[in-house]
């Protein structure tokens, strides 16, 4: 959540957004109350750290809520909690139907639905079922199961307020994962003489256009901590979400990428080769690969999260393969740990690593885990999905020569390679 967003929130909603709520603090011992809505009510929830409107619930529907404060109750919503105005509710005696009974038979499937428009929530998997409420567009929501109704319509089962509700499959999309974009070097076209045919070098104008597209299309740039929460099914995120990563820690990132990201209000991760951090800034030279200095890394930290690209392992061995692949697990672990120590003045929580040149093996995976890293990214192409191995995460490239339409197609949720789910009849 940005500082500006925090200023706009009452203190109760700010505490709610960061998870410091009464029910969470009390855990399972928190009192749970069954309530009925006196009128249609808007609902809010933290999505990527910002409390936003996420839908509405209809008059007379019932749900289970937890005490929060004098103004709000909270309730189960997706991978977290939602928020509803106390004035819109009244406690009721437990109805003949015990809410939450069906949930015991259902578990999260490591699959989400995506709302591309306002999406109706039904009480039962029937076309003429009563309507419980609506979900707003641009949400990811965990699916508990799917089934076919008597009329052959496919339905998704989800948990709202500790009860099973139903969404028609043709009212939403299946989540195909979050794109993690990879960048390295940024130059102006008129100064790029040596790296024009290098796929890892983009132009400042192309990068500006790409970041402008993300902004205008409504994409939210995520931190790796939020991506970790997505993998663990512990956070609510928008449907339009992307992670931006920069490998190496080149000076061109400070010179060109940083001001562009700042202009569009984006955040990104810089994977730094810790042994190449300079003590003092170097005079700019577009014809060489220069690395950021201590002061330059500090300046970009309002936009960039500083993470590891190893210490001495970013090089090739004599056989032209990443040197990491020829090292023992112990030596890899020592390098990973050293990199985290060197980067600690910039970030006390160096928890994520990018394998040099995308090269990794079982030894590198285990070394990353033992060194205390919680995610590791590769250069294998694809999106990140719940259930993926956190130490072999895929990424995508957007090239200098790619059109904005090509980029939009690459990051959109429009592919069909999602894992099939069992259907209950």
Give the location of each predicted region.
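Short, solvent-exposed loop/turn elements at domain surfaces
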Residues: 43-46, 74, 122-124, 188-193, ...
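Bacterial N-terminal signal peptides that target proteins for export
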Residues: 1-10
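N-terminal pre-catalytic segment of deacetylase/amide-hydrolase enzymes
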Residues: 116, 150, 163-241, 402, ...
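SH3/SH3-like beta-barrel superfamily modules
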Residues: 53-86, 134-169
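Metal-dependent polysaccharide deacetylase catalytic core of the NodB/CE4 family, i.e.
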Residues: 176-201, 239-242, 256, 262-361, ...
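Boundary regions of SH3-family modules and the immediately adjacent low-complexity/disordered segments
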Residues: 26-31, 76-108, 157-186
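Bacterial N-terminal signal peptides
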Residues: 10-19
